[in-house]
Amino acid sequence: MFSIYQIKDAYKLIRSNINKTPILFSDKINYLTKSNIIFKAENLQKTGSFKIRGALNFIGQSKNQDFVAPSSGNHAQGVAAAAKLYNKNSTLVMPSDAPLSKIQGVKSYGGNIIFYDRYKEDRVKIAKKISLEKGYDFIPPYDHKDIILGQGTLGLEVLDQLKDIDFVPDTVLCCCGGGGLISGLSIALKSQWNNLNIHPVEPEFWDDTKISLKEKKRHIITNKKSSICDALLSETPGELTFRINKKLLSFGISVTDQQAMEAIHVAYEYLKLVLEPGGAVALAAALNYSEVVKNKNVLVILSGGNIDKKIFLNSLKTKIKKL
């Protein structure tokens, strides 16, 4: 298990290259959910998601000049941006159906993209082959100490921000793909509030962490269905991340694509924020699982905002509760 002190060391390394993203609240969303919610708006981070934190921490400690990473899009942008900040080179293995906004983002940071078929090929195997053949450093999306500690810096910021407003959460809702963000976040938050309930939120049919927590072992998703939450389509939890998460997390929650789209609409309507589907699942859980949030102080992590315009406009057509 890693410590808050290691996360503090990571923060010292990366803080000059990241945004300290704001915390926000909405009386209207509190009314809808009958709870008291604080939002961490990590969609306002550089590259549009939390992923740059881990990438900066990893690359900042490596002596290599070249890096390769498998990614659905946000990790790719984080790695490309971090490599550029350190004047290094990046190659990203991305699905051919990745959102255009994420592809354009990677290219804007100078990343070299290699596309693969999400449903037929293994991006990790492709990236590791490149690493072996060319001597590039392989940067995993979540299952590595430096990635976890880098993502944990988000939790370190939250500790500081909530202290300033005297807010003590009862419950935390955070997206979960491979588990890198929520494991680092949990280490940070549990250093202050050991009895905190932290729930991973995943897309329906891709709830491998939810099932793994129930079964007390890593579950593998075999029936791969499509989902609009492209950033969270992990078929099994990371080995390292799950060792942490099975000790620190409460039960998992899954949300539908429709609920994620409605949450994007709610975020735009009441927070004036733009979220991507995977970045909105924690809000979707708050809106749809009253038994988890009602009459509680809740921290909701809004993890990313890299959404294609067409999907965003479609989200605004969904029906949401108006006040």
Summary of predicted features, one role per range:
Residues 1-323:
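PLP-dependent amino-acid enzyme catalytic core
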